[in-house]
Curated annotation (Swiss-Prot):
Encoding gene, per UniProt annotation: rpiA
Enzyme class: isomerase
Subunit structure: Homodimer.
NCBIfam families cross-referenced by the UniProt entry: PRK00702.1 (NF001924), rpiA (TIGR00021)
Cellular-component GO terms for this entry: cytosol
Taxon lineage: Archaea, Methanobacteriati, Thermoplasmatota, Thermoplasmata, Thermoplasmatales
GO-annotated biological processes: D-ribose metabolic process; pentose-phosphate shunt, non-oxidative branch
Protein name: Ribose-5-phosphate isomerase A
The organism of origin for this protein: Thermoplasma volcanium (strain ATCC 51530 / DSM 4299 / JCM 9571 / NBRC 15438 / GSS1)
Protein function: Catalyzes the reversible conversion of ribose-5-phosphate to ribulose 5-phosphate.
HAMAP family named in the record: Rib_5P_isom_A (MF_00170)
EC number: 5.3.1.6
Pathway recorded for this protein: Carbohydrate degradation; pentose phosphate pathway; D-ribose 5-phosphate from D-ribulose 5-phosphate (non-oxidative stage): step 1/1
GO function term, MF aspect, one: ribose-5-phosphate isomerase activity
Amino acid sequence: MPDYEKQKRNAAVEAASYVKTGMVIGIGTGTTARYLIEELGRRVSEENLKIKGVCTSKKSEELARAAGIEISENPEQIIDLTIDGADQVNLHGTLIKGGGGALLREKIVAYNSKEMYVIVDSRKIDDENFGSFPLPVEVVPFLHRMTLENLRKICPSTDLRKNSDGTLFITDNGNYIADMKFGRIRETNELEKKIKSIPGVVDVGLFNNIADKIFEGNDDGCNIYVVSEKGRIEKEKGQFK
């Protein structure tokens, strides 16, 4: 059976090898990003790597500080490179993100970066079933029931995310997450615009035209894909199939 944790680690370690001293690095959130933080922390300790990290969640910031990474909460310069995971990736390089509830900060950091690298295991690139992972939408608490009903006009199977104890999940920004269960998504640009046009919606976990490279870990190493000018992901040497 595939070792998905090993795959995540392989993707994270390969992407981390692109980080150089002096860079400001956007640090993602989630299980794969944890391996990134571990590797960056190792390089800080063993290789004297000097970087500043901009974290996309309080949890990632906590892990990064513990790993010895210097944190910059509001950098004056543009972020050189953001490395983050994804819940799903299609063949156009569009991402579904927000499974960990940090989609707003993740999008802000990625948007303000020179480049964004995505680290995933071998399950995550799935064009045919893109949208089978629920699409997270961050909404403000004020009149959230009305916002939820407006989202249900687009996708009837939409519910507010809850914690294991039944309480509503609250983001680091004090907002709620609505998960939209489409099953399949095709017109990602139009869908993003439609959802964001609803008052009460802060942002949506569709990342269009943001990713530059995809690092897909496998049991033996890592495949690297670039998002071409044609809007397709391609192997750095040869077409993705």
